[in-house]
Curated annotation (Swiss-Prot):
Keywords: Electron transport, Heme, Iron, Membrane, Metal-binding, Mitochondrion, Mitochondrion inner membrane, Respiratory chain, Transmembrane, Transmembrane helix, Transport, Ubiquinone. One of its GO terms (biological process) is mitochondrial electron transport, ubiquinol to cytochrome c. GO terms for molecular function: metal ion binding; ubiquinol-cytochrome-c reductase activity. It comes from the Eukaryota. The chain crosses the membrane at residues 33-53, 77-98, 113-133, 178-198, 226-246, 288-308, 320-340, 347-367. Binds 2 heme b groups non-covalently. The cytochrome bc1 complex contains 11 subunits: 3 respiratory subunits (MT-CYB, CYC1 and UQCRFS1), 2 core proteins (UQCRC1 and UQCRC2) and 6 low-molecular weight proteins (UQCRH/QCR6, UQCRB/QCR7, UQCRQ/QCR8, UQCR10/QCR9, UQCR11/QCR10 and a cleavage product of UQCRFS1). This cytochrome bc1 complex then forms a dimer. It is a multi-pass membrane protein. PROSITE patterns: CYTB_CTER (PS51003), CYTB_NTER (PS51002). It is found in: Mitochondrion inner membrane. This is Cytochrome b. The gene is MT-CYB. It comes from Geomys pinetis. Heme b b566 binds at H97, H196. Heme b b562 binds at H83, H182.
Length: 379
């Protein structure tokens, strides 16, 4: 009789994805973040579901319903802070996952990479709509500023903004539809994550050397299931430390004040994980140009497979490209810092230089470095 996991129609899918999956024998800890993103998604959907049971998406009661969750619901404060900090954790894992993909040349699996970019856009949309829901000062003004960017689109911009708002300003209709979007998007993300995995398992995982490893693959279980579990334990320890000791460390104090359309906060800024893109947006003096730069800061990732000039896949044995990669990482940290600063000298020029560096490294310097390395190796 055949083993059930190999014959049962449902178990067979799980078996091919998580048990008998042939995996390269040398993938490092940087490959753990895919499974950790899955954990983050499950965590966010489950905590979000319990929050949605008590939340009301009405401008008059949204803020007090969040207060009610924290004060009156059993462990409501824990669920709320797990959900809020879970978003930060999600983006930390997401950015490391993308960074690993760039470093080891995983973007050459074009379908998997493009679905990954789509997942990034959807996750950003989910985080943005979620940030509006507590209806604090930063929620309201963040929604006003970011949705207003669409008015830069020629001809249809203003109509588009009013269509999204459901009126002539950010109000009850906006909050209700943002809640609807925030609820449905994670399930779309979960479905797309399955497609992401499907395409990945068509080609098999990449590895640090960037060379085919078909001759020495090992089954996923027990080797990588155990390794992933270690990552899960470490991530949960970090997460619970953040939630239980520093729950408000990554939030904005302004969001503890109810939304007031008549009073603008001194510095309107998004959550920390969007600050790099916000800095790029602000570094362009023209509104439409800023919006294009903002979208391109993420969309530029889709060009990576076509900008790959090196004969080697991974950066492991390419010191010149490695230097540029870490310059890019440093540049992103710099942009994140600038995004949280007021628009005044010297921050303006630092942001503009960092933005130019960001696009230059990806679009010009890394392809050139690949060609130089080929030349040096006489390839």
């Amino acid at each position: 009789m055949a083993i059930m996991r190999k014959s049962h129609p449902l178990m067979k899918i799980v078996n091919h994805a998580f048990i008998d999956l042939p995996t390269p024998p040398n993938i490092s800890g940087w490959w753990n973040f895919g499974s950790l993103l899955g954990l983050c998604l499950i965590l966010q959907i489950s905590t979000g579901l319990f929050l949605a049971m008590h939340y009301t998406s009405d401008t008059l009661t949204a803020f007090s319903s969040v207060t009610h969750i924290c004060r009156d619901v059993n462990y409501g404060w824990l669920i709320r802070y797990m959900h809020a900090n879970g978003a930060s954790l999600f983006f930390i894992c997401l950015y490391i996952h993308i960074g690993r993909g760039i470093y080891y040349g995983s973007y050459l699996y074009t379908e998997t990479w493009n679905i990954g970019i789509l997942l990034l856009f959807l996750t950003m949309a989910t985080a943005f709509t979620g940030y509006i829901l507590p209806w604090g000062q930063m929620s309201f003004w963040g929604a006003t500023v970011i949705t207003n960017l669409l008015s830069a689109i020629p001809y249809i911009g203003q109509d588009l903004v009013e269509w999204i708002w459901g009126g002539f300003s950010v109000d009850k209709a906006t909050l209700t539809r943002f809640f609807a979007f925030h609820f449905i998007l994670p399930f779309i993300i979960a479905a797309l994550a399955m497609v992401h995995l499907l395409f990945l398992h068509e080609t098999g995982s990449n590895n640090p050397l960037g060379i085919p490893s078909d001759c020495g693959k090992v089954p996923f279980h027990p080797y990588y299931s155990t390794k992933d579990f270690l990552g899960v334990i470490m991530l949960l320890m970090l997460f619970l430390t953040l939630v239980l000791f520093f729950p408000d460390k990554l939030g904005d104090p302004d969001n503890y004040m109810p939304a007031n359309p008549l009073n603008t906060p001194p510095h309107i800024k998004p959550e920390w994980y969007f600050l790099f893109a916000y800095a790029i947006l602000r570094s362009v003096p023209n509104k439409l140009g800023g919006v294009v730069a903002l979208v391109m800061s993420i969309l530029v990732l889709a060009l990576l497979p076509y900008l790959h000039t090196s004969k080697q896949r991974s950066l492991m044995f390419r010191p010149l490209s490695q230097t540029l990669f870490w310059m890019l990482v440093s540049d992103l940290f710099l942009l994140t810092w600038i995004g949280g600063q007021p628009v005044e000298p010297p921050f303006i020029i630092i942001g503009q230089v960092a933005s130019i560096m960001y696009f230059s490294i990806i679009l010009l310097l890394m392809p050139m470095a690949g060609l130089i390395e080929n030349k040096l190796l006489k390839w």
